[in-house]
UniProtKB/Swiss-Prot annotation:
It catalyses: octanoyl-[ACP] + L-lysyl-[protein] = N(6)-octanoyl-L-lysyl-[protein] + holo-[ACP] + H(+). It is found in: Cytoplasm. Its EC number is 2.3.1.181. In the reaction, the free carboxyl group of octanoic acid is attached via an amide linkage to the epsilon-amino group of a specific lysine residue of lipoyl domains of lipoate-dependent enzymes. PANTHER family: LIPOYLTRANSFERASE 2, MITOCHONDRIAL-RELATED (PTHR10993:SF7), OCTANOYLTRANSFERASE (PTHR10993). Keywords: Acyltransferase, Cytoplasm, Transferase. The active site is at C177 (acyl-thioester intermediate). Substrate binds at R74, G75, G76, D77, V78, T79, F80, H81, A146, I147, G148, G159, F160, A161. The keyword ATP-binding does not apply. It comes from Koribacter versatilis (strain Ellin345). Residues 29-216 form the BPL/LPL catalytic domain. InterPro entries: aa-tRNA-synth_II/BPL/LPL, BPL_LPL_catalytic, Octanoyltransferase, Octanoyltransferase_CS. One of its GO terms (biological process) is protein modification process. This is Octanoyltransferase.
Amino acid sequence: MIQVLNLGHVDYTTAQQLQTTLVDLRKRGVIQDTLLLLEHSPVITMGRNAKQKNIVASQEILAQRGVELIECDRGGDVTFHGPGQLVGYPIFDLRSLNPKIGVIEYVRRIEEVLIRSCGDLGIPTTRVEGLTGVWTVNEPQAKIAAIGVHISRAVTSHGFALNVTTDLDYFKLIVPCGISDKPVTSMQHELGKSLTLEEVMPVITRNFGFIFKEQVLWLESLNDLLPTPEDLPARAPETLRRLHEDDLHLG
């Protein structure tokens, strides 16, 4: 079973804190495999292999554009998250899958989910040998989705970022994923029309169920995932507790 939760708009730091909590709960068997779907405010993230030279813009320009700069523990180099981009964070225990899989197969499966989803929505995409992510088929090949993961004791965090209606000018602030010879694109650019994240989410979710051979269950709120505040760590960040309390109040 894969539980799916649409968190809407969440800042990157809060999402990191939530992932840390959920990874701990998944390791302890408190929750099942969970897929978080969300959208971030403008932020450049630096993965474990990030090179400072791949941030082209100065701190002043980033501040003017309202773009945060945050280091994180995912794999990969530098990437951008922001409005119009569908971000997915699977919190999966790879040992619970049948058969169990390793990190390379896990990343290949996420790529396949994205390739199938883009195809379902009218955009032919593929892999590029030697590179991670999903790319358009037509020349010049452009990256439409980035993938960067972290795995701790077989439990995954971080995940993918699919450009739906993302403002591609933001990617001029960096060398995306350290790849200078291939452009970045979006679903809107490829289709010549706009899609909402809410239109894309069910397609992504359906393909997660198909590729990982699991049933999918949509949750209404974080309250359904964390039934009581006691499930949060004793010293959970205030932003995370507030996010949970907001869901409780909505209920």
